[in-house]
Amino acid sequence: MSTNPIQPLLDVLYQGKSLSREQTAELFSALIRGEMSEAAMAGMLVALKMRGETIDEISGAADAMRAAAKPFPCPERNNNPLHNGIVDIVGTGGDGFNTINISTTAAFVAAAAGAKVAKHGNRSVSSKSGSSDLLAQFGIDLTMSPETASRCLDALNLCFLFAPHYHGGVKHAVPVRQALKTRTLFNVLGPLINPARPEFMLLGVYSPELVLPIAKVLKALGTKRAMVVHGSGLDEVALHGNTQVAELKDGDIIEYQLTPADLGVPLAQISDLEGGEPAQNALITEAILKGNGTEAHANAVAINAGCALYVCGITDSVKAGTLLALATIQSGKAFELLSQLAKVSGEAHVNGQERGR
């Protein structure tokens, strides 16, 4: 199919000018439909990268991908005063560190503490073991149907949504992204296109320069409340140093720093959080969720779960959130939740409910 309809938009980019939100959505819609050549795709991504993507351009790309995503049937939002919305705990990846699966493990803890967590994840980007790599170790079906995932969210407070299962059109960009061998707009899009459309987000970014822009994008996309964080090199709240935060609340964005002391836990070394292959990380996650993890592992997970609990309104401060997360870890409830999710996932698969996707 001819790429002529989008050529004028590409020409704008090649001239070093920016596109509107609607124009960017039009370009990315063409990409998702498979109507853009790989050469044009590479040109578009490089032109955006070299100039630096605007808030409108990131928002427009997210609009297109959200619109094209496989629908997710969200359970009733307001059937419980505590559950005034869904939260995601997610990072861009690509921070260059091979840590344990902090955000994935934190999702179990936050859910066991009362949050409704719909975690949007993919296979590994920078570490040896991404969210989906870890879940597979526990027998959690990465391709469970949207209906089964929704039932898990309703009954267990938690579901995991495997990005490629909901965003099939992204496959057209894979060869180009692999050939370019550099970060592109796609590296920040993943956390922005959760098909559950969470009202609340704890979103970690790989660069401190992205913290404020991504908070502005979340505001543009209609996110109710969020913390965008970069923790001393990590795409999550840091246990080994300061965390830069841009918090979106009531339509305003405020910037500040958090230290481990602010969260009520001692400083640790980044080496204390080193991860391994999926099988090794699964053992670490299991130990943490049973309350048997190292102090550093438990605290790293708790400060991230705690910030998520704060963002979705279950606690009124990040420190209170961290304390609730630590108590939840010690109770073993988070591991019970993991076991229940694996059981439901396995039963759905065996019963054939996952066929015909």
UniProtKB/Swiss-Prot annotation:
GO terms for molecular function: anthranilate phosphoribosyltransferase activity; magnesium ion binding. 5-phospho-alpha-D-ribose 1-diphosphate binds at residues 91, 94-95, 99, 101-104, 119-127, 131. SUPFAM superfamilies: Nucleoside phosphorylase/phosphoribosyltransferase catalytic domain (SSF52418), Nucleoside phosphorylase/phosphoribosyltransferase N-terminal domain (SSF47648). One of its GO terms (cellular component) is cytosol. It catalyses: N-(5-phospho-beta-D-ribosyl)anthranilate + diphosphate = 5-phospho-alpha-D-ribose 1-diphosphate + anthranilate. Its EC number is 2.4.2.18. Keywords: Amino-acid biosynthesis, Aromatic amino acid biosynthesis, Glycosyltransferase, Magnesium, Metal-binding, Transferase, Tryptophan biosynthesis. InterPro entries: Anthranilate_Pribosyl_Tfrase (IPR005940), Glycosyl_Trfase_fam3 (IPR000312), Glycosyl_Trfase_fam3_N_dom (IPR017459), Glycosyl_Trfase_fam3_N_dom_sf (IPR036320), Nuc_phospho_transferase (IPR035902). Its cofactor is Mg(2+). Binds 2 magnesium ions per monomer. Pathway: Amino-acid biosynthesis; L-tryptophan biosynthesis; L-tryptophan from chorismate: step 2/5. The keyword Transferase applies. It is an enzyme of class 2 (transferase). Mg(2+) 2 binds at residues 235-236. Homodimer. This is Anthranilate phosphoribosyltransferase. The lineage of its organism: Bacteria, Pseudomonadati, Pseudomonadota, Gammaproteobacteria, Alteromonadales. The gene is trpD.
